[in-house]
From Swiss-Prot:
Its cofactor is [4Fe-4S] cluster. It catalyses: N(6)-dimethylallyladenosine(37) in tRNA + (sulfur carrier)-SH + AH2 + 2 S-adenosyl-L-methionine = 2-methylsulfanyl-N(6)-dimethylallyladenosine(37) in tRNA + (sulfur carrier)-H + 5'-deoxyadenosine + L-methionine + A + S-adenosyl-L-homocysteine + 2 H(+). It comes from the Bacteria. GO terms for molecular function: 4 iron, 4 sulfur cluster binding; metal ion binding; N6-isopentenyladenosine methylthiotransferase activity. It is found in: Cytoplasm. The lineage of its organism: Bacteria, Pseudomonadati, Myxococcota, Myxococcia, Myxococcales. [4Fe-4S] cluster 2 binds at residues 157, 161, 164. Residues 143-372 form the Radical SAM core domain. [4Fe-4S] cluster 1 binds at residues 11, 47, 80. Pfam families: Radical_SAM, TRAM, UPF0004. This is tRNA-2-methylthio-N(6)-dimethylallyladenosine synthase.
Amino acid sequence: MKRYFIHTFGCQMNVNDSLRMSEVLSQMSYAPTPVPDNADLIILNTCSIREKAEDKMLSALGRYKPVKASRGALIGVGGCVAQQEKDKLLKKVPYLDFVFGPDNIARLPDIIGRVSAERERVVETAFVNSEEYVFPRADPETSRGKVTEFVTVMKGCDNVCSFCIVPHTRGREVSRAFPDVLVEVADLAKVGVREVTLIGQNVNSYAGGISFAQLLLRTAEVPGIERVRFTTSHPHDLSDELIEAFRVQPKITPHFHLPVQCGSDRILKMMRRDYTVVQYLERLAKLREARPGIAVTTDIIVGFPGETEEEFEMTMQLTEQVRYDNQFSFVYSPRPKTGAALREKDWGPVPHEVKIARLERLQKLQRRISGEITAALVGSEVEVMVEGHSRYDATKRFGRTPENRTVNFDGDAPAGSFVTVKVERATPNQLAGKQVALLKPPTVEPLPVPMAEAPFHVVAEA
């Protein structure tokens, strides 16, 4: 049997796409391998949100070149870099066999067949017409024994933020019909999945026959589902209806990832974000009033063209004011075809060393805030959904709180259980403690394997 290895870069959408790739390959009688040197097929599922991710991809391709020389392995590149660069990648990497975009995962059998039979180098990056697009869905049998799963509800983005390449690599917004979403969720619940994460580039603008708030509420009503998460959201589309859903349905987890990007109204306007800092804070205040204790995380870009020291300080002040539970912060990276990249010289590029210094200051501030938030939980008891053995110590269990905080703990509850854990230690990014009570057993017999890791054939990195 031929074996495959998938190397994933970037966001949860890419992780989900890689899982769908693995299902397609399994149907082709490929088996996964955790060792790329043993693979007959290597796929890099790429991210182009930052230049650094592209550099990592090219570095990884270089590492996999000897596998092609020794085993004759096929090497393909999928994801957003593939969509962006198309046939340029074949010219840049002579040993690359095929390139395919996010819309073309279902065509992998044809692509691989053409490469194998005809030794043809293939590029498939056409966006599928919205009426013809078939959303990837998890195979319930593949998901059997898992306790958490992604469910795609939409793709693409109609916002044109000046820093973002996603509209060019993922296309226009297309929403999945809500009955199809609910059928997939129900199928997953029947095989033991207890938490689903509804994903899309901008889920708040979902338009699959009902509003996104209504979709969340209906998903929470599916028998067997205990937790409903989602990502990613745009502050401009955070509606009162969605906030009310957090108030009335406890299964919608108290965690909201709400990317602010920066703390300056002038920069937000240049970014084309369509909200001000005051408007963002007003939405956030309503959310916290509706769901006290909700964990809020964010994305921040440092060193956007034209950002002054005073404007960076506004971002620092906003971080201190909001007290995010965590944040994903990066230096600005110009992306092809984006408005900011085209106007960077006019707006004034921020020197690299200034970007790095600002990022280090911001991340230091966030580590302090995150540490204060988690330290306050020491001595308390938290609810944890057990996902399996800890990746750090196989004698311990691993899971997450409703607020999406990682917990490693002493206990014996199987994956899929809900337990109470007394928090004994905390770092800015995780909690540790011991199990003190079993709240709910799993709904199906758990698999006798660790669940804390991603599937071993999908190696993910940012």
